[in-house]
Amino acid sequence: MVDHLANTEINSQRIAAVESCFGASGQPLALPGRVLLGEGVLTKECRKKAKPRIFFLFNDILVYGSIVLSKRKYRSQHIIPLEEVTLEPLPETLQAKNRWMIKTAKKSFVVSAASTTERQEWISHIEECVRRQLLATGRQPTTEHAAPWIPDKATDICMRCTQTRFSALTRRHHCRKCGFVVCAECSRERFLLPRLSPKPLRVCSLCYRELAAQKLREEAREGIGGSPPQLSHLGGTVCGASSGDDDDSDEDREGNGDGDWPTQVEFYASGVSWSAFHS
C-alpha cells in the first residue's frame, strides 16, 4: 500500500500542505518514495511542563512541531529518521496514562495519547514503519539512546547532592548524560558527547567521573603513549564556564514557564491524537 501511494498526486498534496503549515522555518519534506501515513496531536513532556505537539508519521521519518494554529500554522519543526527510533511503553499511573518514550541517539522524550486505543495505534504504526525502514536500509536497530530529561517539576532539590533546594535564584540544570535535574555545583563539568553535540556539554559530577574513567580505559586499551589525556577540568572546575553560560532549555521552552501541568482538556483540545491518511 505504501509503495503504491508513494508517487500519487494526493500524497504529494498532503505533504505540500504539511510543508505549508511549517512555512519558511521548516525543511522541505517531499522526496521520491516518501509517503505521509498519518498525523495527530500528542502531549510531549517538556522540561517545564507537558505541551501539545503536532506529529506527522511518514514511511521513513517522524516529524513534530509546536502548534500555533491548528491545521494552519506550526513551528519548531523536528525531523527524526525512523531507522534511529526505538519505542518504550511506559507504565500507567493515576496521574499519567497512555504514555511511551520515543528514544533516539540524539534525543529521547516522553509523549502521551488521548486514549489507550490511540496510544496503541501510534505505537503499532511507528514500529511497523521502523521495521520496514530498517529492512530497506539494511541497518541494525540503534542500541545507544540519549537519556530523557527529567521534568523540572519532578523535584525541588538537586538529584545528585540532595541538599541544594531550587528557587528563583537557584536554577535547575540538566545533565546531558543521565538527564537528572541538578544544581550548578553538581554540574560544573563539561564532556564531549559526540552523539549529541560537537561541543562539550554539561554533565553531572557522577557522570563526568564515569565518562572520564571510561575515556582513560579506552585510551589505555588503544595503547596511546605520551602524556596523559588533557582532562583539564578533572578537578571539578569548568574551563571558562559558569552556572548560566550554556543553554539548559530544550526546543520547547517558552516564556518563563510556571511549571504547572496543563489539564487534560488543554492537552487534547485539537481533537483525536491519531488520524490515518492511508489505512
UniProtKB/Swiss-Prot annotation:
GO terms for biological process: apoptotic process; endosome organization; positive regulation of autophagy; protein localization to plasma membrane. It comes from the Eukaryota. Keywords: Apoptosis, Cytoplasm, Lysosome, Metal-binding, Nucleus, Zinc, Zinc-finger. Zn(2+) 2 binds at C175, C178, C204, C207. InterPro entries: PH-like_dom_sf, PH_domain, PH_domain-containing_F, PH_Phafin, PKHF1_FYVE, Znf_FYVE, Znf_FYVE-rel, Znf_FYVE_PHD. May induce apoptosis through the lysosomal-mitochondrial pathway. Translocates to the lysosome initiating the permeabilization of lysosomal membrane (LMP) and resulting in the release of CTSD and CTSL to the cytoplasm. Triggers the caspase-independent apoptosis by altering mitochondrial membrane permeabilization (MMP) resulting in the release of PDCD8. It is found in: Nucleus; Cytoplasm, Perinuclear region; Lysosome. Zn(2+) 1 binds at C158, C161, C183, C186. SUPFAM superfamilies: FYVE/PHD zinc finger, PH domain-like. PH and FYVE-type zinc finger domains are required for lysosomal location. One of its GO terms (cellular component) is perinuclear region of cytoplasm. Residues 220-263 are annotated as: Disordered. A zinc finger (FYVE-type) spans 152-212. It holds the Pfam family PH. Residues 244-253 have a biased composition (Acidic residues). CDD domains: FYVE_PKHF1, PH_Phafin2-like. Residues 35-131 form the PH domain. Widely expressed. Signal peptide: none annotated. This is Pleckstrin homology domain-containing family F member 1. GO terms for molecular function: phosphatidylinositol-3-phosphate binding; phosphatidylinositol-4-phosphate binding; phosphatidylinositol-5-phosphate binding; zinc ion binding.
